[in-house]
Amino acid sequence: MIRDTATNTTQTQAAPQQAPAQQFTQAPQEKPMQSTQSQPTPSYAGTGGINSQFTRSGNVQGGDARASEALTVFTRLKEQAVAQQDLADDFSILRFDRDQHQVGWSSLVIAKQISLNGQPVIAVRPLILPNNSIELPKRKTNIVNGMQTDVIESDIDVGTVFSAQYFNRLSTYVQNTLGKPGAKVVLAGPFPIPADLVLKDSELQLRNLLIKSVNACDDILALHSGERPFTIAGLKGQQGETLAAKVDIRTQPLHDTVGNPIRADIVVTTQRVRRNGQQENEFYETDVKLNQVAMFTNLERTPQAQAQTLFPNQQQVATPAPWVASVVITDVRNADGIQANTPEMYWFALSNAFRSTHGHAWARPFLPMTGVAKDMKDIGALGWMSALRNRIDTKAANFDDAQFGQLMLSQVQPNPVFQIDLNRMGETAQMDSLQLDAAGGPNAQKAAATIIRQINNLGGGGFERFFDHTTQPILERTGQVIDLGNWFDGDEKRDRRDLDNLAALNAAEGNENEFWGFYGAQLNPNLHPDLRNRQSRNYDRQYLGSTVTYTGKAERCTYNAKFIEALDRYLAEAGLQITMDNTSVLNSGQRFMGNSVIGNNMVSGQAQVHSAYAGTQGFNTQYQTGPSSFY
């Protein structure tokens, strides 16, 4: 059933008949005016209340036009997907109208229902429809600055629009429309369709989005119905087969379902390979690739401690390098041929991020690139904030691997931190929301316990032997909110996150005050978040140009190093043995490696890898389900 709430009719109904030919009739006689003095004065609750009292059919704002077009497009795409791609015709597409329900933006709702223990359960995935023709009121923040008060105006982003009130109204509407007023509504993760996406020209992307949205509903329904979880025991493969992790260093972004660019300097792909290197099917690789995780390496400046000598004859301790590498995870996904996205599959894919420590792959994006006039990743910019106080010419002909190694060793601490950008409105909204809850808040304990349960499902149990989540966090918030969006480098659409700390240092060209201004706009806790965001966007325009467009927000969180290392050891002991396909050691064999952990969240070693896949034993685990979400 595909229903338009503006007309309360389904798409399969016949088109209305044409209006009859115009006829001239005698004007009706005037009726005596009735007195209205005795009637109570109506109450108008905002614009919507006035429109309800004084009904007119036209809407000059045009806020409903994009939702109407989206419903038409998705209706056609559903027919195609059912006919051509074996998509089951057991879901509904509903139009949740902003004017009818008095919310910021309309959405299309992909809804699928089952009966669980006699109770109807409806999974919904709202596809939010930001609309450039609708000007939402800005959020105003008063900031006291000495004797004066500054007013900061902030744009409303899609995550703010999708509030608890929005979801509650959407849930009631879905229940009533599907005739299940007492049904339990579970969220399969909201996802915005970019305002600048031309719907009629993007049918391939939107058809994939429709199919993935139906699968997302299946994922959350399967979670509630007790589907047997994915386990690594099922990856033992056939004789002569192994799992390999391939590390690619890229300059081009990945893209999500609707074409948003995703920064992906490092991509670790897990795949099945034959030990002799031969494919079982020469031109068919659907069953080869399993998953991938994308990252980039940011550099964080650390406060420099003064070296101290407690006794006159004591040797002075060397000050640690001033920069810490942060490996930021930007994308976690299964191979296109895998329809399901379960929590266990997510943790399997994410665990491979730690493999970027093997051969110090996390540092490889900083290797000098020749022929690039304006290199945002030029590691030579670190020279501006060193004792040299000048850029190091990494493009020079005599700048070799040994010099690169010396530069890295002197300026960057050898053990990276692992971070992740979590987006409640993204492709992996369910897992991102779960981790944000675990990072702090009223659901922190439940969320952390749920994550541990999912990892136990993946490996067969016993993760608590490697990591005790009751005494330490899985991950922590940094207070850094990341603007998601894009910019154009010539004709190429790229991720706004290209502007990281090293890129800003390159752009500042030695102006240290300017760099610190940029850095403070990212995470200075002494500045109000709205003020930081305004300053950050000013730097975006200064460094990236006027083409910057914002599509949402993510929160950057830092993984506990003990959790990342424990996950690697746990999966290795459970039988997950992976070889590295194409890694190399930097600096002509020089070991770019630390001897101890520096800081609370820097990992202390490298991922475990194996020469062959030897896991043959199976594991059994009791799958657990919870109420409304993962809990």
Curated annotation (Swiss-Prot):
Inducing or repressing factors: Expressed very early after infection. Encloses the DNA at 45 mpi.
A GO-annotated cellular component: host cell cytoplasm
Alphabetic keyword roster: Host cytoplasm
Chain positions covered by the region annotation Homotetramerization: 590-611, 622-631
Function: Self-assembles to form a proteinaceous shell that encloses the viral DNA and compartmentalizes proteins and DNA during viral infection. This micrometer-scale compartment contains narrow pores and is the site of viral replication, with the proteins involved in DNA replication localized inside. Provides a surface for docking of capsids during packaging. Probably protects the viral genome against host defenses.
Compositional bias (Polar residues): 32-59
Family: Belongs to the Phikzvirus chimallin family.
Protein name: Chimallin
Location in or out of the cell: Host cytoplasm
Subunit-structure text: Homotetramer. The tetrameric protomers further assemble as a square grid.
Species annotation: Pseudomonas phage 201phi2-1
Disordered: annotated span: 1-63
Biased composition range(s): Low complexity: 1-29
KW Mitochondrion (keyword) present: no
The UniProt record lists the keyword Isomerase: no
